[in-house]
UniProtKB/Swiss-Prot annotation:
Keyword Secreted annotated: yes
SUPFAM superfamilies registered for this protein in UniProt: Kazal-type serine protease inhibitors
Site positions for Necessary for sperm binding: 21-22
Name under which the protein is recorded: Serine protease inhibitor Kazal-type 1
UniProt-listed PROSITE patterns: KAZAL_1, KAZAL_2
Primary gene name: SPINK1
Organism whose genome encodes this protein: Canis lupus familiaris
Amino acid sequence: NNMLQRQANCNLKVNGCNKIYNPICGSDGITYANECLLCLENKKRQTSILVEKSGPC
C-alpha cells in the first residue's frame, strides 16, 4: 500500500549517522539500520528512496 510510504526525515547537514539500530524498510526493498542511513544513501546516489515501513523489509 503506497499510502504508507513517506519521505525519510533527513537532516542533510549530517554527514554521518549514529549507530542506533532502528531498522526501516526502504521503497527499494533494502533494510536500513536507521532512517539517517537511508538519507545518506539518497544523498550519495541522488535518489529519493522512501520509507516503506518501520522495521526490516
